[in-house]
Regions:
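Short catalytic-loop micro-motif centered on adjacent basic/acidic residues
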Residues: 48-55, 145-149, 172, 248-250, ...
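Conserved residues at the C-terminal ends of beta-strands
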Residues: 14, 52-55, 113-116, 150, ...
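Glycine/proline-rich, positively charged
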Residues: 21-22, 29, 39, 86-204, ...
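N-terminal binding-site loop/beta-alpha segment at the start of enzyme catalytic domains
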Residues: 1-77, 134, 140
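Short, electropositive alpha-helical surface patch
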Residues: 62-76, 165-171, 263-269
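Structured C-terminal cap/extension of enzyme domains
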Residues: 39, 47, 66, 189-374
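Hydrophobic residues in well-ordered beta-strands that form the structural core
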Residues: 50-51, 81, 203
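Short beta->alpha linker loops
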Residues: 55, 59, 152-153, 254, ...
Length: 374
């Protein structure tokens, strides 16, 4: 890990869920509250701010300029932003994102530049557009200090990407205590792969999009019994803070109270006691036990599906609904995670069920998913 990475505070400020003046308008960022949030974060020792070309429909970067860049010296903070090449209609437009981001941010360079959400068919778009070489060239020209990528795929995909692109300075991964040994996310294995390549990790989704803060009551009670004074959020963040090879842990903060709480929890961070670790293990076991579809993500069902239904993804989302008891949240995830092959396109041919080693009634489960999420 680079020396400057060693001194990066472990709490990072994610600028994807900023406070809004109008909840129905993602562009209506509450700048005055955002300024207070930035001040509180920096006063608490934070320096890392994470944004992206598309956050808040393109206004997050400009808001960060107003709340941070225009008000603090350049050596008081670091900024990460991202390129979504797979959403661009041409290589030229994808490459122009960086210049636009720099203009919006009011910066001559960004400290961290990510090729965002690499994986699956999206990787081919980054390759075809020459984005890997473009990002490295931007680093050579001083427009970018560090180049990396974010991804949601498993460990084998990460291994392939880091082997193909050994020049990466960092990688951004979904890591949290619920996904640590998840057979789809493979957070533990991904962390091991990154460490083996000597690439530090920026952690995203440490609280699973807020779901580890809104736990089912019986799960929350297990954690509170072990430490009545600890917030549910602090359990999620402490798990990530104390992992090796972590550059920083992002929190998408939406109001001043969240910043204050996260800063306080960060400043009080310590490793879990044996009792706390047992409580977390019990909480995870309970959450896992609430997942009733025994899918292991073997993916035997996918290859011959004539409709291209993303069956393991959909079954995983059904399990997530059971674990979190929050259908609205999972429905939001479904809208993009299942977009390549939604449940309603199933024609009930039964090919998948014939291939499933777990004997899952897949056709029925897809009907349930379509009813719940579409």
């Amino acid at each position: 890990m680079k020396p400057e990475f060693e001194t990066t505070p472990k709490l990072g400020f994610g600028c994807m869920r900023l406070p809004l003046l109008d909840p129905a308008d993602q562009k209506s960022i509450d700048i005055e509250q955002f300024k207070q949030m930035v001040d509180t974060f920096i006063e608490g020792g934070g320096t890392y701010f994470d944004t992206a070309f598309v956050y808040h429909e393109g206004t997050s970067e400009r808001a960060l300029k107003e709340a941070l860049v225009d008000r603090y010296p350049r050596d008081a903070y670091t900024v990460a932003t991202k390129c979504l090449a797979w959403a661009a209609p041409s290589a030229e437009e994808a490459k122009s994102n960086l210049a636009t981001s720099l203009e919006r941010l009011g910066l001559d360079y960004v400290d961290f530049y990510l090729l965002h959400n690499v994986g699956g068919e999206r990787t081919a778009k980054f390759d075809a557009y020459g984005m890997w070489d473009f990002a490295l060239d931007a680093k050579e020209r001083g427009l970018v200090k560090n180049v990396g990528f974010s991804m949601h795929d498993g460990a084998d995909a990460l291994e392939a990407l880091l082997t193909a692109h050994p020049q990466m300075d960092f990688v951004q991964l979904q890591v949290n205590y619920l996904d640590w040994d998840d057979p789809v996310v493979e957070a533990r294995r991904c962390m091991e792969v990154a460490a083996a390549h000597g690439v530090p990790v920026v952690v995203m989704e440490p609280a699973r999009g807020g779901r580890l803060v809104e736990l089912p009551q019986r799960v929350a009670d297990v954690l509170r019994e072990a430490n009545p004074d600890a917030s549910l959020a602090s359990w999620a963040y402490r798990f990530c803070y104390n992992l090796p090879n972590v550059l920083t842990v992002l929190s998408g903060m939406s109001n001043l109270d969240q910043v204050r709480q996260n800063v306080a929890d960060y400043q009080a961070n310590r490793p879990f006691s044996p009792e706390e670790q047992r409580a977390m293990d019990a909480a995870v076991e309970t959450l896992r036990g609430m997942a009733s579809v025994p899918c292991t993500n073997c993916r035997y069902c996918v290859k011959d599906c004539p409709q291209g239904v993303v069956i393991p993804t959909i079954l995983g989302l059904l399990n997530l609904e059971l674990m979190t008891e929050n259908r609205a949240f999972v429905k939001g995830l479904y809208s993009w995670q299942a977009a390549p092959g939604p449940a309603s396109t199933c024609i009930a041919c039964g090919t998948c069920e014939a291939m499933c080693p777990q004997g899952i009634d897949i056709v029925h489960q897809l009907e349930v998913a379509a009813e719940h999420f579409e």
